[in-house]
Amino acid sequence: MNKILNFKKKLQNNNNNTNNNNNNNNPKASILKNNNNDNTNDNLKSKIVVKSTPVIQKSSSFANVPNSINVNTSSSGNKNGDKPILLQSMFNKGKRSNEITNRKIPPPFSEDSFYKSGVTSKVSTTTTTTSSTSKPILPQTITKPNKTNETIVPIPPIKKPISNNNINYNNINIQQSSSTCTISNRVRDNLFLLKEESKSEYNIRVNEIEKKVISNNNIDYNDPYTQTIQKIIMVEKEMIDTFSAMIEFQPLQNLAQTQILKSSSRLSSNNNNNNNNNNNNNNNNSNLLFFFDDQNN
């Protein structure tokens, strides 16, 4: 029995020794161990560091100053007195009078001084001091270096073409100039043949439509389909006349292009209106654009 009790005491002593060693190596355990002793160990006090965040407090001594704050970085307060930071001075627009030195005022720009060489431009410089009155310095004279080999190329005036004769087309007087009509005879002949072929083909198609559709006694002129065909024929005649004028007289090219665009837009609008009015009509009126095929055989 005594042997058992002695063995139990040895076990307890060993456990106490191991716990003490672990506690000595662990700083947290040492802090907890000395909590009851009111932290009498100076080394433990030096190890425990409490970081304080900056506290922004309203300054009491600068209560009447707007936008003033007191930045206190210590946990126990500022013992040396309040040192307020004026926000108004931190965010001031511009500079203070004692920070401005040798402010230069450039002269107004002038074309004569820019193009002419050896022109002296005056730059007035003023300095301000901390006193209430500022004394301006006399203007300094700066001489620009002479520019060598400076040439100014003049812009030639725009010359209007000389008009030889006036061409009256659709009650519009258009001047034909000799400088713009530079088409060779061979190209002009080819364009003339193209115009004649297009005219002849166009006339054949128009005659066929007039015979089969418009000249029919039983036709209803109030029918949207018939009205569309009549408008197409009228617009196509205008386009052929404009095309021939564009070939014969080159100054009419811009006018001809504008006229063709207007005519084509009229054709497309008429075709859309006809399709909207004839929903049950199976004929596709878009085939009538520039191709006068008879669809009412």
From Swiss-Prot:
Coiled coil: none annotated. Residues 12-43, 65-85, 122-151, 265-297 are annotated as: Disordered. Residues 122-135, 268-287 have a biased composition (Low complexity). Transmembrane segments: none annotated. Residues 65-79, 140-151 have a biased composition (Polar residues). This is Putative uncharacterized protein DDB_G0291005. It comes from Dictyostelium discoideum (Social amoeba).
